[in-house]
């Protein structure tokens, strides 16, 4: 006859629940116990033909799809999208501007014609400030002086 210690209850079989628990642990959590980790590591191969599980592929795709950024980078990107980059206006960029070139050439030609035709009179040409602000804005100090006198 069998002794009570030798009886095997199918529900209390020490090997099968442990295997089921290990499989459930692999499926449910990403954190593995050291014993389970050793068993899983033994199953690994260097064969590239081994197919990866769909779960791991989906996790990898989700990780790759979401860019890593912190809060400050997100705020900076939102601000930059609201205000697009504009070029800085410098003296060189003004000199390269084709419309500004045409204006300068016309002004130079008019001045040369007046000088050649002896049309130059001292009071005919008003004072022009040569600073960059007046040059860029086409600001006429004589007009502003007249406004101040009123």
From Swiss-Prot:
Please report the organism this UniProt entry assigns to the protein. Mus musculus
Tell me which tissues or organs this protein is expressed in: Expressed in the immature oocytes and in newborn ovaries. Subsequently detected in maturing oocytes and in preimplantation embryos. Expressed in pluripotent embryonic but not in differentiated somatic cells. Expressed in blastocysts, epiblasts, primordial germ cells, embryonic gonads and primitive spermatogonia. No expression is detected in adult testes.
Q: What does this protein do?
A: Primordial germ cell (PGCs)-specific protein involved in epigenetic chromatin reprogramming in the zygote following fertilization. In zygotes, DNA demethylation occurs selectively in the paternal pronucleus before the first cell division, while the adjacent maternal pronucleus and certain paternally-imprinted loci are protected from this process.
> For this UniProt entry, what's an example GO CC term?
nucleus
**Main localization category:** nucleus
This protein's name:
Developmental pluripotency-associated protein 3
Pfam families associated with the record: PGC7_Stella
Q: Where is this region: Required to exclude TET3 from the maternal pronucleus?
A: 76-150
- Keywords, in A-Z order: Chromatin regulator, Cytoplasm, Developmental protein, Nucleus
**According to the UniProt record, where is the region Disordered?**
1-32
UniProt gene name: Dppa3
